[in-house]
From Swiss-Prot:
GO terms for cellular component: cytosol. The active site is at residues 323, 352, 456. It catalyses: alpha-D-glucose 6-phosphate = beta-D-fructose 6-phosphate. It is an enzyme of class 5 (isomerase). The keyword Cytoplasm applies. Catalyzes the reversible isomerization of glucose-6-phosphate to fructose-6-phosphate. This is Glucose-6-phosphate isomerase. Keywords: Cytoplasm, Gluconeogenesis, Glycolysis, Isomerase. It comes from Geobacter sulfurreducens (strain ATCC 51573 / DSM 12127 / PCA). PROSITE patterns: P_GLUCOSE_ISOMERASE_2, P_GLUCOSE_ISOMERASE_3. GO terms for biological process: gluconeogenesis; glucose 6-phosphate metabolic process; glycolytic process. Pathway: Carbohydrate biosynthesis; gluconeogenesis; Carbohydrate degradation; glycolysis; D-glyceraldehyde 3-phosphate and glycerone phosphate from D-glucose: step 2/4. Pfam families: PGI (PF00342).
Length: 529
C-alpha cells in the first residue's frame, strides 16, 4: 500500500474510546477486507459465551467452577448477593487495613511504622502485583515493595540483604496462595519466617495471609495469630486475580489508589461488553490474534511497550495469555495443541536488540506496540532545538512500526494517555477480556492449567526419588555411581534423574554428599559424609 492507502486504512479501523482514553490501531495487520464479516458469526458466539460466564455459568468445566474476575470490579453483576457483599467487604477491608498500617494503628513491634512490604507468592500471586508496583510506584510510595517470587535461595537472600535486619523490623509480609499448598510459596514463607527469627522478630506479628478459606495457609495464619487474613475465592484464577485482594492489598499498602485502578478496569469492562465488534477493543485484539496465528498459535506476539514503567507488562501477559491459551485439548476433547507465545521487553531498548531479526529475519510473529502519550510529570529538557527525549521515544516507536510494515511484518498499536492507576486498570481488563474472547473463538477452556499441575506432580516425583537416593547413600555407605544407585533402588530407568539430583546435592553442603568426578561426567561416583 502507498502512504495514502495506509492513511485511509488507519482512519477506517482506528478505535478511540473517550471514557478510557484508549486508542487501538489494527491497520498494520494484513487482514482482508472481508475478514470481519467472515468472523462475525464466531465473534457473536464468543460474546454469548462471555455473557453466560459473567452471569455465573460454569465456565471452567474441568474444575466445575464459575469464573468471576469481572465481578471483582462490578460486584452487582455477581449471580449471588453473598458474593457481591464479600467483594465489597474485601475492598473496604483492604482499604481500611492499608490506612491503619500507614497511620500506625497496625504497627511493627520494634518500629514505629511498617515501611516495607514483602510479597511472598508465585505466578499470578506475584506477576500482577510486581507489574502494578513497578508501573505505578515512585518516590512517594507509602511502603517499598519487595518480592519472594521463586524458590531460589540466592534470590531470597538478595532481597533480605537489601532489607537488612533493621529493614526487616519495618517489613510487613504478605503470603499469597489460594490453596495454601503451593510449595514455592510455602518455601518462601519458611525462609522469611527464619529470617525474622534470626533478627529476633516474631514473624506472626508481621504476617498477613491472602488465601482460600480453610486452606492450609488459612489455618496456619489463624493458629499463629497473624495480623490479618484476606480471601481468595475459588472462582478467581491466579492469573486473573489482580483486581482481587491478591493485587489490591500490595498496591494499597504501597499507596496506590486502588479504587481508581478498579474504576479503570470497570470502565474497560463496560467498553469491551459491546457487541459491535469494530467498537470493542478486546474483540479486535482477539480477532487480530486469530488472524495473525490462523487460530492455531502459528505466530508469536512480541509486546513492545515504549515506556519503562511497562517493562514488566510482557511478563504479566506471558502468564495471562500463555497459561490461558496454551492447551492440548479443545472443549470437545480434540487434540489441538493451541497457544499464543508472548515475549518482549521495552522500546526503544529493543531496537538495539532483536528488532533487527523482526525486520529482516524469520517472519513468525506480530508486534503489539504499547504507546503512552504523556512523557513525564512536568516540563522536559530540549535535547535538540524543539525536541525532547520523549519526542525521540515516540519517533522511534513510529519509525519501528514503519520499518516493520515496509517488510510486511504485522503490528498493532495500543495507546493510552498516561500511566495512572486508572489506565493500568484499563490495560489489565482489556487483555483479560481479549483472552476470554479468543478462547471462545478457538474453542478451548481458558481457565484451567493441567500442564502446570503435571509439572508440579513430576517435581514431586523427582524430590521423592532424590530422597530415596540420598537415604540409600547414607545407609549403604561406600562410593556409588548414579547407575548403581538406580539399579539398587529397582529404578534403572531413573538413572538420569538420580544423577542430576546428586550433582545438585554435591554442589551444596546441606546434604553432605561428596562427588568424585569422572570422565565422562555421568560415571562420577557419590558418597555421603
Amino acid at each position: 500500500m502507498n502512504a495514502h492507502e495506509l492513511w485511509q486504512r488507519y482512519q477506517t479501523y482506528l478505535l478511540f474510546d473517550a471514557d478510557t482514553g484508549l486508542i487501538l490501531d489494527v491497520s498494520r495487520m494484513a487482514f482482508s477486507d472481508d475478514f470481519f464479516a467472515s468472523m462475525e458469526p464466531a465473534m457473536q458466539r464468543a460474546f454469548d459465551a462471555m455473557e453466560r460466564l459473567e452471569a455465573g455459568e460454569i465456565a471452567n468445566p474441568d474444575e466445575n467452577r464459575m469464573v468471576g474476575h469481572y465481578w471483582l470490579r462490578s460486584p452487582e453483576l455477581a449471580p449471588d448477593p453473598a458474593i457481591a457483599a464479600a467483594i465489597r467487604e474485601t475492598v473496604d477491608r483492604v482499604t481500611a487495613f492499608a490506612a491503619d498500617v500507614h497511620n500506625g494503628v497496625v504497627t511493627a513491634p520494634r518500629a514505629r511504622l511498617f515501611r516495607n512490604v514483602l510479597v511472598i507468592g508465585i505466578g499470578g500471586s506475584a506477576l500482577g502485583p510486581q507489574f502494578v508496583a513497578d508501573a505505578l510506584g515512585g518516590h512517594g510510595d507509602r511502603m517499598r515493595p519487595f518480592f519472594f517470587d521463586n524458590t531460589d535461595p540466592d534470590g531470597m537472600d538478595r532481597v533480605l540483604e537489601t532489607l537488612g535486619a533493621d529493614g526487616l523490623a519495618e517489613t510487613l509480609a504478605i503470603v499469597i496462595s489460594k490453596s495454601g499448598g503451593t510449595k514455592e510459596t510455602r518455601n518462601g514463607m519458611l525462609e522469611a519466617e527464619a529470617a525474622y527469627r534470626r533478627a529476633g522478630l516474631d514473624f506472626s506479628r508481621h504476617a498477613v495471609a491472602v488465601t482460600g478459606a480453610g486452606s492450609e495457609l488459612d489455618r496456619t495464619a489463624e493458629a499463629g495469630g497473624w495480623l490479618c487474613r484476606f480471601p481468595m475465592w475459588d472462582w478467581v484464577g491466579g492469573r486473573t486475580s489482580e483486581t482481587s485482594a491478591v493485587g489490591l492489598l500490595p498496591a494499597a499498602l504501597q499507596g496506590i489508589p486502588i479504587r481508581d485502578f478498579l474504576d479503570g478496569a470497570r470502565t474497560c469492562d463496560t467498553l469491551t461488553r459491546r457487541r459491535e465488534t469494530l467498537r470493542n477493543p478486546a474483540a479486535l485484539l482477539a480477532l487480530m490474534w486469530h488472524h495473525a496465528t490462523r487460530g492455531s498459535g502459528s505466530r508469536d506476539m512480541v509486546v513492545l511497550p515504549y515506556k519503562d514503567r511497562l517493562l514488566l507488562f510482557s511478563r504479566y501477559l506471558q502468564q495471562l495469555i500463555m497459561e490461558s491459551i496454551g492447551k492440548e485439548l479443545d472443549l470437545d476433547g480434540t487434540v489441538v495443541n493451541q497457544g499464543l507465545t508472548v515475549y518482549g521487553n521495552k522500546g526503544s531498548t529493543d531496537q538495539h536488540a532483536y528488532v533487527q531479526q523482526l525486520r529482516e529475519g524469520t517472519n513468525n510473529f506480530f508486534v503489539a506496540f504499547i504507546e503512552v502519550l504523556k512523557d513525564r510529570e512536568g516540563a522536559s529538557l530540549a535535547v535538540e532545538p524543539g525536541f525532547t527525549s520523549g519526542d525521540y521515544l515516540s519517533g522511534f516507536l513510529q519509525g519501528t512500526r514503519t520499518a516493520l510494515s515496509e517488510k510486511g511484518r504485522e503490528s498493532l498499536t495500543i495507546t493510552i494517555p498516561a500511566i495512572t492507576p486508572r489506565t493500568v486498570g484499563v490495560l489489565v481488563a482489556l487483555f483479560e477480556r481479549a483472552v476470554g474472547l479468543y478462547a471462545s473463538l478457538v474453542n478451548i477452556n481458558a481457565y484451567h492449567q493441567p500442564g502446570v499441575e503435571a509439572g508440579k506432580k513430576a517435581a514431586g516425583g523427582v524430590l521423592a526419588l532424590t530422597g530415596e537416593a540420598l537415604a540409600f547413600l547414607r545407609r549403604e555407605g561406600g562410593t556409588l555411581s548414579a547407575t548403581e544407585i538406580a539399579a539398587a533402588l529397582g529404578r534403572p530407568e531413573e538413572a538420569e534423574t538420580i544423577f542430576r539430583s546428586l550433582l545438585h546435592a554435591a554442589a551444596n553442603p546441606d546434604h553432605g554428599v561428596v562427588m568424585e568426578a569422572a570422565s565422562p561426567l555421568t560415571r562420577s561416583r557419590f558418597s555421603a559424609r
